Amino acid sequence: MKRFLFFVVCALMLAGCATQNVDKEKDNQSTTSKKVYDSNNQKEQAISTSTGNMFEIKNGVLVRYKGGYNKALKIVLPQKVKEIASKAFILTKDEKKHVGELKVSSIEIGKDVKLHKNAFYGAGPLKVTLLDGRINVEKHSFSEMGKYGCESEIFMCESIKTIEEYAFYEENGTKKVYLNNNLERIEKSGLYGAAYSDLPDSIKYLGSNSLGYASKQITKLPENLEYIGEHCLTLYGGKIKVSSHVKKMAVNAIVWECTNSDVQGYEVDKNNLYYKSDSNGWLYSKDGKKLFYAYRLPSENNVVIPKGVEKVYKKGVYMYGDDFAPGEKSKIINS
């Protein structure tokens, strides 16, 4: 009997120890789980704090981006940002010394975020996407973005209709703009100095100096184009096609830089109601009475005005000095 009681007591003691071990293991697991949760929570908090410290914002205006360009980041604007101030993304003094080492970051700009003049002046390397719903690109907003030599890209959403004056103006040519298919207007110097994708046929208006020096060979202007401003585009040779929709062209609308190319000038669609061109690429009014563009042919010593031309616009006649012979009734217009 005593031996039986002894075994019962031992069994109870072993069961108690096992229960204590299980409880202890559960406590350890709970403690470990709590530590992991706290660690993750602290990490998330750190990221959140870091993100918050990337921007200086005053009354809804992003005054300064402080995240730097040493890492490739996806910059997410806080929802409270309604405007971007001048030079908000400009490089620091130290970053200007190490331009070649900076990383490309990306950022999306909402349709309701207003861009101030020079908002991206002197910025680091960026890929900027303008989100759908935006109607225009504001004046000077991306002007001189590559001031310090950083290369950037801007992707335009399909809703944009107008590139305003000097919006993408650039002296260094370190920026490329991807144009959308519904674009209608590029105003004065809107893309001057920037590289850009093919011109969409939707464009109706090209202001003076709007395209600047061609970053690649352009042989055709947009199909729906109606107006071309002065010095709209500068080419280095080759003819350019003008559609039947063009109604108004400034004298010197297209400029051909000094070139050894024998091929230059306009090729106007025969159905155009306002202009025509000849086999040399010279540009006339539809009735042939006005000469807007001409250059000295390789076979001639001077520019000879064809018979029937009554007005010659001197600013559009490319020659050396004044050595051209006007037609019998032509009048030289110095404008």
Segments and roles (model prediction):
Residues 1-4:
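Positively charged n-region of N-terminal signal peptides that target proteins for export
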Residues 14-16:
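C-terminal motif of bacterial Sec signal peptides marking the signal peptidase cleavage site
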Residues 18-20:
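Bacterial signal peptide processing site
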Residues 22-50:
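N-terminal, intrinsically disordered, polar/charged segments of Gram-positive cell-envelope systems
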Residues 50-58, 68-83, 94-114, 124-136, ...:
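Structural signature of tandem-repeat unit edges
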Residues 88, 119-120, 141-145, 167, ...:
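Periodic small-residue-enriched repeat registers in elongated scaffold domains
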